[in-house]
């Protein structure tokens, strides 16, 4: 080969090498991804602040013997860009990993991780995603709950599953998944990490709330419904006729009578045969056809209660007593959703209810263990199984309303699957002074503050199950008695002021007079009309357990809403600072005209332009609408 040929060959090689190395970019108005396939370097940039996050490596695997397989131990086999998506394939003799980078909804981003074994099942103790070091100033996890969002400079980082552990310490951050089952060649495990940004510290909660509503399967929308619990059923079966009678009563007094749409009649515990197979009981031998048709005739639908772990008290014991007969797995005296046999049946039955009975909402009550692994299960825990179940349910009917109760926690990641979760604590209880209704309200809100506001400050209050409005014949602690009009109005308006979209009515119709029906109708209509504001609802004020004044605030540019309550039997002063209460962004109006929606208080100015001290009377509940002053 002469010198000229050699030079040409070298040049061709360099061109070829350069052709195989490239830098890829994805971007939208909020975030930009950059990936260099030669250096394997990945970075994400906040378009607004310029802050940059670049992980030490995109991922790494830790084996049971603590050996670590780094991303550098993999070979990149493919990089494919299509629209707003970039896929990167990583190959290793024992594992394959695919990264899927996406920019979402105009200002967010995500990285999907899919991990599979090669050749045979492989043990992996832990998968670590997006590990950073020294990339941000004092990053932290905002919340005490596993999988709470990581906050790093102007970024918030969230996993798609509540079983993922988020970690931040001394300028390092990562997301970890501990695996209890081998990774399979044909059944990869998948996780997604979401990224969003916030323009200023005061807007972190609102930015997270907006992000969740943008990507959740069913955007925020009030779901107002009757629930049979403590009314026609309370650990007891009920009949088709019981349900039809209630439908007639609600139609007469509320739906047709006062022009309020009821989204559903939810049938709580009492409809199944208690065999543990989730089959219809004798009272519904023909399924829900009759009640479904009746509901449709009044522009409503049917919702349904099921309990993955089997329910509560004697009905649960009766269901679980059949576990051995049908080969269903149990843990601690309850069904285990992650058990192969039980999951197969539960999943099959719930899909049948969706497809054949046209159920529009589910109250899944009791999600089971988070730490126990069932032998031969494909799932690490019942939490893992519940995520798979909900995915299947959504695939069958995307617009389902899914409420998860006991067994969940204040991880915002639940809202990538469910529409609401439990506020924690007891169904109903009493705390503090006052009538049973006032004590119930204080307990409800004290539990919310203790378990949600403090432990999961970025969890949207608009997606909590508060246990609704209670005035039912089989309730307890005094809530089974007819309430005064004032107490019922306080309970009703304070409930709708929470902004929750799960609007449960545990009400026996005969316990409401015309005044109460009017209150309920007015508040429900107000909630639906103001949903675009109430979606932003967040906590204001103090701790109900300490009997401090507290409440709820929500804001949008055109309008804001404030609800306050004094849980004490003594008058209390409250420092009213609407800029702080509404979490108003920089540059927006801070002077308002206040319009009373519920209650009246002479110490509250009709025109607000500066912080002021107001006084709430004992047990006073107040709700205002605030519009920017002209």
Task: Write out the residue ranges for each language-model feature.
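Bacterial N-terminal signal peptides that target proteins for export
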Residues: 1-8
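Bacterial N-terminal signal peptides
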Residues: 8-16
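Acidic-aromatic substrate-binding/catalytic surfaces of carbohydrate-active enzymes
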Residues: 22-87
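Conserved structural scaffold segments of CAZyme catalytic domains across common CAZy folds
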Residues: 85, 92-94, 103-111, 116-317, ...
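Active-site-proximal substrate-binding groove within the catalytic cores of carbohydrate-active enzymes
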Residues: 186-187, 386-601, 613-626
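The substrate-binding groove and active-site-proximal loops of carbohydrate-active enzymes
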Residues: 227-244, 271-285, 328-345, 368-383
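Active-site-adjacent "subsite" loops/lids of carbohydrate-active enzymes
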Residues: 232-237, 301-357, 368
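Active-site groove signature of glycoside hydrolases
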Residues: 259-271, 345-376
């Amino acid at each position: 080969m002469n010198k000229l040929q050699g030079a040409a060959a070298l040049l061709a090689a360099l061109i070829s090498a350069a052709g195989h190395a490239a830098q890829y970019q994805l971007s939208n108005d909020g975030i930009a991804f950059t990936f260099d396939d030669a250096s394997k370097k990945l970075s994400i940039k906040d378009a607004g602040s310029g802050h940059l996050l670049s992980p030490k490596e995109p991922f790494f695997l830790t084996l049971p013997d603590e050996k670590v397989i780094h991303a550098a131990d993999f070979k990149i086999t493919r990089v494919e860009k299509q629209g707003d998506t970039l896929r990167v394939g990583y190959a290793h003799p024992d594992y394959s990993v695919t990264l899927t980078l996406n920019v979402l909804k105009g200002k967010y981003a995500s990285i999907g991780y899919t991990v599979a074994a090669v050749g045979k099942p492989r043990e992996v103790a832990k998968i670590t995603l997006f590990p950073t070091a020294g990339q941000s100033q004092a990053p932290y996890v905002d919340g005490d709950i596993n999988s709470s969002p990581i906050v790093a400079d102007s970024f918030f980082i969230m996993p798609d599953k509540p079983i993922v552990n988020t970690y931040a310490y001394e300028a390092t951050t990562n997301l970890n998944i501990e695996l209890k089952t081998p990774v399979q060649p044909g059944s990869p495990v998948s996780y997604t990490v979401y990224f969003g940004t916030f323009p200023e510290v005061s807007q972190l909660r609102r930015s997270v709330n907006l992000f969740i509503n943008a990507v959740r399967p069913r955007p925020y929308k009030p779901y107002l419904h009757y629930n049979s619990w403590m009314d026609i059923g309370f650990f007891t079966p009920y009949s088709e006729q019981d349900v039809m009678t209630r439908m007639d009563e609600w139609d007469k007094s509320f739906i047709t009578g006062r022009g309020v749409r009821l989204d559903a009649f939810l049938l709580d515990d009492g409809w199944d045969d208690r065999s543990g197979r989730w089959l219809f009981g004798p009272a519904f031998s023909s399924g829900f056809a009759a009640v479904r048709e009746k509901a449709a005739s009044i522009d409503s639908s049917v919702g349904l209660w099921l309990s993955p772990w089997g329910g509560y008290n004697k009905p649960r014991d009766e269901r679980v007593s059949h576990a051995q007969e049908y080969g269903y797995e149990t843990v601690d005296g309850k069904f285990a959703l992650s058990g192969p046999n039980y999951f197969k049946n539960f999943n099959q039955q719930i899909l049948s209810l969706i497809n054949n009975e046209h159920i529009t909402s589910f109250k899944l009550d009791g999600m089971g263990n988070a730490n126990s692994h069932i032998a031969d299960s494909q799932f690490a825990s019942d939490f893992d199984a519940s995520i798979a179940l909900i995915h299947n349910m959504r695939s069958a009917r995307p617009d389902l309303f899914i409420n998860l109760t006991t067994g969940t926690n204040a991880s915002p990641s639940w809202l990538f699957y469910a529409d609401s979760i439990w506020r924690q604590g007891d169904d109903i209880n009493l705390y503090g002074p006052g009538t049973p209704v006032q004590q119930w309200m204080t307990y409800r809100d004290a539990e919310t503050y203790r378990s949600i506001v403090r432990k999961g400050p970025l969890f949207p209050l608009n997606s909590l199950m508060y246990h609704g409005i209670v005035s039912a014949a089989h309730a307890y602690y005094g809530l089974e008695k007819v309430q005064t009009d004032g107490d019922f109005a306080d309970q009703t308006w304070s409930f709708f002021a929470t902004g929750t979209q799960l609007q449960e009515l545990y009400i026996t119709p005969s316990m409401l007079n015309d005044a109460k029906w009017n209150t309920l109708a007015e508040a429900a209509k107000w909630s639906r009309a103001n949903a675009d504001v109430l979606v932003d609802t967040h906590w204001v004020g103090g701790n109900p357990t300490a009997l401090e004044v507290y409440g709820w605030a929500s804001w949008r540019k055109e309008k804001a809403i404030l609800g306050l309550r004094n849980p004490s039997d003594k008058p209390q002063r409250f420092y009213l600072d609407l800029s702080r209460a509404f979490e108003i962004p920089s540059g927006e109006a801070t002077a308002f005209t206040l319009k009373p929606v519920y209650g009246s208080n002479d110490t509250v100015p009709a025109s607000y332009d500066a912080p002021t001290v107001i006084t709430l009377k004992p047990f006073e509940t107040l709700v205002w609408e605030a519009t920017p002053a002209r």
